[in-house]
Regions:
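Non-core capping and flanking segments associated with repeat-based/extracellular domains
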Residues: 1-299
Length: 299
């Protein structure tokens, strides 16, 4: 590889001016190349907040993207089933497994990794192990999906972000999906009508952040059994007693001990904020102090 014939400073300057997508492609070329990128581009790699695998119901084959701290996402790779009518594949050894690749040029160059039908899990695991080694522990690894028919691979250091629509929900399958999923980071329920509460033992209540959007319902069903840190509720109506009971139980210190933040919005009219604040005995934050802030993964 002629690149290594250049002086080190020239190599470093070249890598400094390469986009993340191209750095990622080069990281597969050889162990030596990957080590050089990690050495010279350490600060850029640490600037990445999330690496995300997205696999939805319409396209069950994931693509991989990253989100740096400037929030400008870059797609790095697609992972697809191998097509027999293509002949321009090349092979690379990824974490001990030989994987077929192509460079797609339909709209812009994109690295595509391929798997045969019986080895999708092993290909994804090998690519994830490569990503762990290349990007390191400073990056948060997320698996985003709205397809609860397919169980998420058990990957190291992976957290799950799930979107659930209420169209003909299969509650048994959904409960099984949650129970088999890796660490639950974020769940968004979008329900046009009434949603049955899950079992009090459901793993869905253990997600770090839950968002419930119910434009035509008055049933924010997650509050009573929630064990996570943050709840975001968007409903057409609330029972004030449900909210005040939740907050008072939270304040008691006996319940919801990991909980940090509750956000509520009512679609029809504003919430009776003063009434709720009076019932729960809320105190105002001093204007001179900075209130705490909370973030969730961008879906």
């Amino acid at each position: 590889m002629k690149f290594f014939e250049y002086p080190y400073l020239v190599q470093r300057e070249i890598l400094e001016n390469i986009e993340y997508q191209d750095l990622y492609l080069l990281s597969f070329v050889s162990i030596k190349t990957k080590k050089l990128i990690k050495l010279t581009q350490n600060s850029r790699l640490k600037d990445i907040r999330y690496l995300r695998y997205t696999c939805n119901d319409t396209n069950k084959q994931p693509f991989v993207d990253i989100t740096p701290k400037n929030d400008r996402r870059e797609v790095l790779m697609k992972i697809m089933e191998r097509q027999t009518n293509k002949n321009d594949y090349f092979q690379l050894n990824v974490s001990g497994k030989v994987i077929y690749f192509r460079i797609s040029n339909k709209s812009e160059p994109l690295l595509i990794a391929y798997f045969d039908p019986d080895e999708s899990r092993s290909v994804i695991e090998s690519i994830h192990n490569h990503n762990l080694d290349f990007f390191g522990d400073s990056v948060e690894y997320l698996w985003r999906t709205d397809d609860y028919e397919n169980i998420i691979p058990q990957l190291q250091n992976i957290s799950t972000c799930v979107e659930v629509m209420d169209t003909a929900l299969d509650y048994a399958n959904l409960e099984h999906f949650f129970s088999e999923s890796p660490d639950l980071k974020y769940i968004r329920f979008y329900a046009f009508g009434y949603m049955e509460p899950f079992s009090p033992r459901s793993k869905s209540y253990q997600t770090e952040c839950v968002e419930v959007v119910q434009p035509n319902s008055t049933n924010p069903f997650v509050l009573r059994h929630f064990q996570g840190k943050q709840a975001i509720l968007r409903c057409s109506e609330y029972e004030t007693s449900d909210l005040t009971e939740f907050v008072n139980r939270w304040k008691s210190g006996e319940f919801f001990q990991t909980f940090e933040h509750l956000s509520c919005k009512r679609y029809s009219t504003d919430l009776p904020q003063n009434e709720i604040l009076n019932v729960i005995g809320a105190k105002h934050i001093d204007d001179t102090k900075t209130p705490p802030t909370y973030t969730v993964p961008k879906m």
